[in-house]
Regions:
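Extra-cytoplasmic beta-strand recognition segments
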Residues: 448
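Bacterial N-terminal signal peptides
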Residues: 10-23
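Glycan-processing catalytic domains of CAZymes
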Residues: 67-444, 452-474, 479-530
Length: 530
């Protein structure tokens, strides 16, 4: 279960440097003394390349040759694919949402990002000064901005709504209670106003929060819903407000039946789409099926468990109900020492493809912005890499067709150290450990969207790994991490570098605190966001 920490991160750099014809020499033409070269050949087919291991039979040889010169980019655009218009995606029967966690907006107090709460929650100096033994509670933060004038909270929500729309999302799932001493929990009116200002078609799905857990009252939830019942931005199906509570099984299903009955008595019709902490639709159906419009689940976070997304959709449909498939990039929790191995971008891609294969009705990205656990919003540590990958899949999910690629894009995903790297046990007393699921992976991944065949190159110091891709498409190329290096990446065609990408994340041989978060970056050669 998520820990509701009231914390927050430092100056925004998006973790990527895209190199085209200008300013590339330092990275793309340096010689490699006694460089070891591994080679791999493959095609970008209909699968996403979830097994991203390098070919164990590849040959290795010494190389001191310089990288080819870089060809200037001419086919510019934000995405590798021709993204459908917002109106086209919005008209699709299938919907995509992201779970919004109110305590962690873009800014907590509208201060300079170098000295705000987010900075205090993530910098090494503040962490050590606080005397913590585990490490910082936050490893990442939203993309930053200078202090704003006027209604800065609503303006920040407007920014996030635009980001979500760019990713193909239809709305946010807002964890909601209206009475709190913490103002961050009571900003639903500002979010609703932001949706109206940016795009009246963007919707907010209510996730009533059990503030007191099993001791929560029906009256408090009913009153919360009645306060916003007439808001046009609320997500409804057939004119009925959708209620999607997280961890609803803390109370009996009769609790939720009573809420809906009371709301109906006030003229407010509603449907229930519970987001269970555990239990598939088949497990929950006996007690819940007569009360729900659909099912959802908080879900798992590893490649090997991704098929539960497909099975959940199949089970929900067999019970005559909708399914909102849980999708996540990763989950790492400094506060209690747990993480789950997501295999770079592998878990995200696997879950998305299983949701498509299972014909899920809706998607729920878990979460938009809970930076203590799992987040997908554009951020300092990942730039737009996760967001752009999601945009590709939401287009596929909604249109039923894998997007064709009209230009190239390169993205990297890797940690800042191996999972077994030495750390300072005097400052971190609880070792990070995998709670369950797939075992630890220590790879650098290049996720490439290719408009035509080409050669992919990953350079880590003197280690150069290559992969020949024989068809256009999305392909994952992953190789073992090399501590003490900062990876760089290339796409080559006809002996020339079409695109080069430099990671902003050095791979450390040893660390003060363990950091199991996957960093990321990248985009198209021009027109993309870092």
């Amino acid at each position: 279960m998520r820990k509701r920490l009231m914390l927050s991160a430092a100056a925004a750099v998006t973790g990527v440097l895209l190199l085209t014809a200008a300013g590339v020499a330092a990275c793309s033409v340096a010689t490699r003394d006694a460089a070891s070269t591994t080679q791999e050949t493959g095609a970008a087919g209909t699968e996403a390349g979830l097994d991203a291991s390098a070919d164990p039979s590849a040959s290795a040889s010494a190389s001191t040759s310089a990288s080819p010169s870089v060809v200037p980019a001419t086919n510019c655009g934000r995405y590798a694919f021709a993204k459908a218009s917002t109106s086209t995606l919005r008209a699709a029967k299938k919907k995509a949402f992201a779970f919004y966690f109110p305590p962690y907006p873009i800014s907590i107090e509208n201060k300079d990002p170098g000295s705000d709460y987010w900075a205090k929650w993530t910098t090494e100096a503040d962490r050590l000064a606080s005397g913590t033994k585990q490490g910082e509670e936050m490893l990442d933060r939203p993309l930053t901005r200078a202090p704003l004038s006027g209604n800065w909270r609503q303006k920040d929500f407007e920014t996030e709504i635009r980001q979500a729309i760019d990713m193909g999302l239809d709305g946010f799932i807002w964890e909601y209670h209206s009475v709190s001493s913490d103002a961050r929990w009571t900003q639903l009116p500002a979010m609703l106003a932001a949706a109206k200002a940016v795009d009246p078609g963007f919707r907010i799905m209510l996730s009533p929060d059990l503030q007191q857990g099993a001791n929560s009252t029906q009256a408090s939830i009913v009153n919360d819903v009645l306060k916003v019942k007439s808001e046009p931005a609320l997500y409804k199906v057939d004119g009925k407000i959708v209620l999607a509570p997280f961890y609803p099984e803390r109370v009996a299903v009769s609790f939720w039946d009573g809420i809906r009955t009371t709301l109906a008595g006030s003229g407010v019709q509603s449907v229930l789409v519970p987001i269970f902490l555990s239990g598939s639709p088949n497990v929950r159906a006996a007690a819940w099926n007569n009360s729900v419009y659909g099912y959802s689940l908080w879900g798992n976070r590893w490649v090997g468990g991704a098929d539960s997304v497909r099975k959940g959709a199949v089970e929900a449909h067999a019970n005559g109900r909708k399914y909102m498939a849980p999708i996540a990039f990763e989950d790492t929790r400094i506060y209690d020492g747990r993480y789950w191995e997501s295999s770079n971008s592998g878990a995200l891609r696997a879950m998305m493809e299983k949701a498509i294969a299972g014909d899920a009705d809706w998607l729920a990205l878990i979460t938009w912005n809970d930076y203590t656990e799992s987040w997908v919003a554009p951020s300092k540590g990942r730039g737009y890499a996760v967001a752009d990958t999601i945009a590709y899949y939401t287009s596929w999910f909604k249109t039923g067709k894998r997007p064709s690629l009209v230009r190239d894009a390169l993205y990297y995903f890797h940690r800042s150290h191996r999972t077994d790297a030495p750390y300072d046990t005097s400052l971190q007393q609880i070792a990070m450990h995998i709670a369950n699921g797939d075992g630890a992976s220590n790879k650098v991944e290049l996720l490439a969207f290719l408009s035509a065949p080409g050669k992919l190159v990953i350079k880590q110091g003197g280690t150069v790994s290559t992969k020949d891709v024989t068809a256009a498409g999305m392909v994952s190329f992953a190789v073992a991490m090399v501590p003490g290096t900062t990876p760089s990446f290339e796409l080559q065609r006809a002996g020339k570098v079409v695109q080069a990408l430099q990671s902003k994340v050095p791979i450390k041989a040893k660390v003060t605190h363990q950091d199991m978060m996957y960093r990321a970056g990248g985009g198209t050669a021009c027109g993309g966001k870092a």
